[in-house]
């Protein structure tokens, strides 16, 4: 299938204006921009790039306050809680430079195992539900069911497991299996999958720097297949792989144009043995700035704290929830450990927020 191009503006380098430097002037400028967004206007690439020029902790915190106002106005105070399970790990055919599961550069402590049993997956779904998660995502290595054949036994087993989770729990099953055909997307929808994770990972321009075994356009095609089947798209990226601020803005704009509902923000926690294993870790305030800019570009989307938040943010994790974040992945990640769910829930409640299931774009205004 030949993919229609995204807006040409996403691929063009633009000159960058400077934001006001004096504190009160910056406050006034951000207030005007914030009100414009709350009233339903969308910022353009030029305005987003100007936001990237805000420097210094005090000024970044002003940007974070603006993002928090937008989050409150457009999404409310519910923090969406989800959990994941790595149902098949290691020996992945793809060469993603950040990932320790790739057969090209396996991480030293990355587990390798085949597809877990339905019983084991169901047990972990029930544990995630008991811990407070509202969604439970089945994540598998590999390029995807699209390349396993129309009668893949593995895909059929996953569909059966999804049906079992839907029947025996109240947690909502999600999947992240890689690329799918329109027919497979429909089968997932009929089994009970209402949201599917397939991260763009980076901007189209930067993508070849981190993956060459498949294209960015391949990922876009799968997102379109999912949405055509009536499945919500969960798609975001990773910060800290060497991308520029313009790359980050282009990623957010592409996600906006695709109409994704949920946007995971991963902060690279470099894995030893991978090509990005020696990457310099993001400064927490750079991460907060990126989160805030994503919120200004994506005012109604579910913006999710995902991998790397504990390692990168440390004691500043809670600031993310006051900088535009309104969702969290709780529990463990694919190949690294997370903090105890009860600690996450306590952090959410300490900020006057509540764990639950956040509204998708447009739903909060409807509820209100």
Curated annotation (Swiss-Prot):
<keyword id="KW-0479">Metal-binding</keyword>
<feature type="binding site">
    <location>
        <position position="234"/>
    </location>
    <ligand>
        <name>[2Fe-2S] cluster</name>
    </ligand>
</feature>
<dbReference type="GO" id="GO:0004076">
    <property type="term" value="F:biotin synthase activity"/>
</dbReference>
<comment type="pathway">
    <text>Cofactor biosynthesis; biotin biosynthesis; biotin from 7,8-diaminononanoate: step 2/2.</text>
</comment>
<keyword id="KW-0093">Biotin biosynthesis</keyword>
<keyword id="KW-0001">2Fe-2S</keyword>
<dbReference type="GO" id="GO:0005506">
    <property type="term" value="F:iron ion binding"/>
</dbReference>
<dbReference type="InterPro" id="IPR010722">
    <property type="entry name" value="BATS_dom"/>
</dbReference>
<dbReference type="GO" id="GO:0009102">
    <property type="term" value="P:biotin biosynthetic process"/>
</dbReference>
<dbReference type="Pfam" id="PF06968">
    <property type="entry name" value="BATS"/>
</dbReference>
<feature type="binding site">
    <location>
        <position position="304"/>
    </location>
    <ligand>
        <name>[2Fe-2S] cluster</name>
    </ligand>
</feature>
<keyword id="KW-0411">Iron-sulfur</keyword>
<feature type="binding site">
    <location>
        <position position="174"/>
    </location>
    <ligand>
        <name>[2Fe-2S] cluster</name>
    </ligand>
</feature>
<comment type="function">
    <text>Catalyzes the conversion of dethiobiotin (DTB) to biotin by the insertion of a sulfur atom into dethiobiotin via a radical-based mechanism.</text>
</comment>
<dbReference type="InterPro" id="IPR006638">
    <property type="entry name" value="Elp3/MiaA/NifB-like_rSAM"/>
</dbReference>
<dbReference type="InterPro" id="IPR007197">
    <property type="entry name" value="rSAM"/>
</dbReference>
<protein>
    <recommendedName>
        <fullName>Biotin synthase</fullName>
        <ecNumber>2.8.1.6</ecNumber>
    </recommendedName>
</protein>
<keyword id="KW-0808">Transferase</keyword>
<feature type="binding site">
    <location>
        <position position="137"/>
    </location>
    <ligand>
        <name>[2Fe-2S] cluster</name>
    </ligand>
</feature>
<comment type="similarity">
    <text>Belongs to the radical SAM superfamily. Biotin synthase family.</text>
</comment>
<dbReference type="Pfam" id="PF04055">
    <property type="entry name" value="Radical_SAM"/>
</dbReference>
<keyword id="KW-0004">4Fe-4S</keyword>
<dbReference type="InterPro" id="IPR013785">
    <property type="entry name" value="Aldolase_TIM"/>
</dbReference>
<keyword id="KW-0949">S-adenosyl-L-methionine</keyword>
<keyword id="KW-0408">Iron</keyword>
<dbReference type="InterPro" id="IPR024177">
    <property type="entry name" value="Biotin_synthase"/>
</dbReference>
<dbReference type="InterPro" id="IPR002684">
    <property type="entry name" value="Biotin_synth/BioAB"/>
</dbReference>
<feature type="binding site">
    <location>
        <position position="99"/>
    </location>
    <ligand>
        <name>[4Fe-4S] cluster</name>
    </ligand>
</feature>
<feature type="binding site">
    <location>
        <position position="96"/>
    </location>
    <ligand>
        <name>[4Fe-4S] cluster</name>
    </ligand>
</feature>
<dbReference type="GO" id="GO:0051537">
    <property type="term" value="F:2 iron, 2 sulfur cluster binding"/>
</dbReference>
<comment type="subunit">
    <text>Homodimer.</text>
</comment>
<dbReference type="GO" id="GO:0051539">
    <property type="term" value="F:4 iron, 4 sulfur cluster binding"/>
</dbReference>
<feature type="domain" description="Radical SAM core">
    <location>
        <begin position="74"/>
        <end position="309"/>
    </location>
</feature>
<feature type="binding site">
    <location>
        <position position="92"/>
    </location>
    <ligand>
        <name>[4Fe-4S] cluster</name>
    </ligand>
</feature>
């Amino acid at each position: 299938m030949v993919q229609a191009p995204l807006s040409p503006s996403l691929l063009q380098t633009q000159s960058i204006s400077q934001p006001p430097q004096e504190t009160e002037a910056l406050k006034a400028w951000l207030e005007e921009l914030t009100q414009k967004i709350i009233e339903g206007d969308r910022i353009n690439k030029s305005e987003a790039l100007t936001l990237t020029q805000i420097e210094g902790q005090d000024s970044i915190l002003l940007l974070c306050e603006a993002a928090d106002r937008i989050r409150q106005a457009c999404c409310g105070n519910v923090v969406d809680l989800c959990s994941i399970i790595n149902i098949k790990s290691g020996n992945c055919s793809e060469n993603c430079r950040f990932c320790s599961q790739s057969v090209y550069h396996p991480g030293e402590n990355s587990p390798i195992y085949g597809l877990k049993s339905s019983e084991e997956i169901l047990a972990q779904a029930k544990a995630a539900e008991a811990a407070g998660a509202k969604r439970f995502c089945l994540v598998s290595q590999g390029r995807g069911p699209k390349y396993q054949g129309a009668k893949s036994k593995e895909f059929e087993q996953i569909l059966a497991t999804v049906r079992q989770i839907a029947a025996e729990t109240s947690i909502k099953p999600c999947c992240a299996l890689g690329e799918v055909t329109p027919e497979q997307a429909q089968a997932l929808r009929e089994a009970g999958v209402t949201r599917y994770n397939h991260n763009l990972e980076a901007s189209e321009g930067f993508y070849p720097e981190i993956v060459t075994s498949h294209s960015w356009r391949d990922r876009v095609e799968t997102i379109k297949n999912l949405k055509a089947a009536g499945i919500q798209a969960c798609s975001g990226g990773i910060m800290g792989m060497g991308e520029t601020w313009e790359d980050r803005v282009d990623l957010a704009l592409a996600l906006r144009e695709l109409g994704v509902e949920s946007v995971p923000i991963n902060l690279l926690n470099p894995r030893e043995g991978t090509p990005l294993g020696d990457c310099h870790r993001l400064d927490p305030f750079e991460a907060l700035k990126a989160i805030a800019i994503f919120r200004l570009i994506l005012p109604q989307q579910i913006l999710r704290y995902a991998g790397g938040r504990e390692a990168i943010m440390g004691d500043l994790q809670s600031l993310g929830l006051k900088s535009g974040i309104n969702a969290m992945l709780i529990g463990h990640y694919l190949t690294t450990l997370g903090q105890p769910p009860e600690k996450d829930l306590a952090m959410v409640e300490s900020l006057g927020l509540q764990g639950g299931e956040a509204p998708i774009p447009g739903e909060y205004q409807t509820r209100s």
